[in-house]
Regions:
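Active-site-adjacent pocket-lining segments in enzyme domains
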Residues: 2-126
């Protein structure tokens, strides 16, 4: 068992059929909603931002997703940026954007100095 109250954020990994399974699981969607309502970090990549849309978490927020899932970002202002951070929600487009997605999560919790240190150790020069 997991004590979700001890966690600072939640990440939905995307992919298919994983995204469909996440969205259909009442326990997952309940936790995602609870994290959002508590102001905790909610992240999703690839097709998984569609789950956030279905949960009502993207209302009034800017978000991105894998090409072809834009219509599932219910309530969001759709962006085609690789990574979008809007308040406590971070979304990203897919596997090719995963390093930037990870660095956005590090940035949310840490300093820019920490982000640069992680970037350096990843040998990621972007």
């Amino acid at each position: 068992d997991v004590d979700f109250s001890e966690l600072d954020g939640i990440i939905l990994p995307g992919g298919m059929p994983g995204t469909l399974n996440l969205g259909a699981h009442a326990g997952v969607t309940a936790q995602v909603k609870a994290f959002a309502e508590a102001g905790k970090l909610v992240c999703a990549i690839c097709a998984a931002p569609s789950v956030l849309g279905a949960c009502g978490i993207l209302n009034g927020k800017k978000a991105t997703c894998h090409p072809g899932f834009e219509e599932k970002l219910t309530g969001a202002s759709v962006s085609y940026d690789n990574v979008v951070t809007d308040g406590n929600v971070i979304t990203s487009r897919g596997m090719g954007t995963v390093i930037d997605f990870g660095l956005a999560i590090v940035s949310y919790f840490g300093s820019e100095e920490l982000v640069e240190d992680v970037r350096k150790h990843l040998v990621y020069n972007r």
